[in-house]
């Protein structure tokens, strides 16, 4: 890996609602364009094939009509374009699994014909869309392991850390933000109702800072791509973002809506402070991270006669402010 680079592009794609064939064709055309710029990997947004920012309003029949299997027409179109151009590509869709369940899935099509699918872990888009149950990390011909976290998956620090612990040094973070407010801000994705705050003021600007922190904490590159539907084509500064393992921004799309591109210096991964701190972790201290809130409260109810190990007893005296100390 030493001395090698990987040229990537983050594409803030604007989808046409419900028109998977059109969106797949547009992505295929985009791969031709980025291939001319020497791009090896192009990252498109969450649900870029399916479209729709607000899937919760779709009827059961509409959602079923939108869903495709992983070997469906849209993925085949994209995979064929990858083979023609030599540019690996990540795209999002509503997946219909063989058992009939629906997932918010993201598929990475590689130049060697391999495909890797991540099912969103925290899916709250529609009551019929099921959450995935595992993290996705895989090897590549570039000598790095790549992880995928879709949308709100990357809001949780534990998910990003898990991909790093599974060996990922490049994190693909496709996203789909909400409709723009009157001020032009794009809200982040909602949490499941049971965890939701009555006031949610986080915006894409907030996520910009989170992603830089996640990259630095874990010593990994993060390639973030945000998408909108065609009726909501206002670009944002954070629509495409590439961050290095020190948390420094390598490239953004700016307000033009064009893709962001950067050369990833893969040798910088092991030199990063985040990787050094990963090696210094003490897992025996972190059991609490795997417990629910209810389990935490039971575990840390202090028993009677408990003493703090390693502490030093301190004594205090109350002295009148006018009394002289002797």
Regions found by a protein language model. Give the residues of each.
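Short beta-strand-to-loop element that shapes/binds the nucleotide-sugar donor at the catalytic cleft/hinge
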Residues: 91-96
């Amino acid at each position: 890996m030493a001395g090698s680079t990987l040229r990537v592009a983050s594409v803030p794609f604007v989808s046409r609602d419900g028109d998977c064939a059109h969106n797949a064709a547009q992505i295929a055309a985009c791969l031709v364009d980025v291939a001319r710029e020497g791009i090896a990997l192009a990252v498109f947004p969450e649900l870029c094939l399916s479209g729709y920012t607000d899937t919760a309003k779709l009827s059961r029949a509409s959602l079923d009509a939108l869903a495709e299997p992983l070997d469906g027409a849209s993925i085949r179109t994209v995979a064929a374009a990858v083979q023609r151009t030599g540019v690996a590509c990540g795209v999002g869709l509503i997946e219909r699994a063989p058992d009939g369940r629906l997932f918010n899935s993201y598929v990475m099509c590689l130049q060697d014909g391999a495909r890797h699918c991540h099912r969103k872990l925290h899916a709250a888009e529609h009551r019929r869309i099921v959450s995935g149950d595992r993290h996705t990390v895989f090897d590549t011909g570039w000598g790095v392991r790549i992880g995928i976290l879709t949308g709100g998956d990357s809001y949780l620090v534990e998910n990003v850390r898990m991909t790093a612990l599974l060996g990922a040094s490049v994190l693909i973070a496709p996203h789909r933000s909400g409709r723009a407010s009157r001020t032009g801000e794009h809200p982040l994705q909602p949490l499941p109702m049971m965890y939701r705050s009555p006031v949610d003021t986080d915006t894409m600007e907030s996520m910009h800072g989170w992603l830089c922190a996640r990259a630095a904490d874990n010593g990994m590159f993060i390639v973030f791509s945000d998408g909108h539907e065609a009726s909501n084509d206002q670009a944002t500064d954070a629509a495409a973002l590439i961050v290095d393992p020190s948390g420094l921004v390598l490239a953004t799309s700016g307000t033009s809506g064009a893709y962001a591109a950067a050369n990833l210096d893969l040798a910088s991964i092991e030199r990063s402070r985040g990787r050094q701190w990963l090696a210094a972790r003490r897992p025996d201290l972190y059991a609490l991270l795997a417990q629910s809130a209810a389990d935490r409260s039971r575990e840390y109810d202090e028993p009677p006669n408990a003493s703090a190990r390693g502490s030093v007893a301190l004594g205090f005296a109350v002295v009148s402010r006018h009394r002289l100390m002797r």
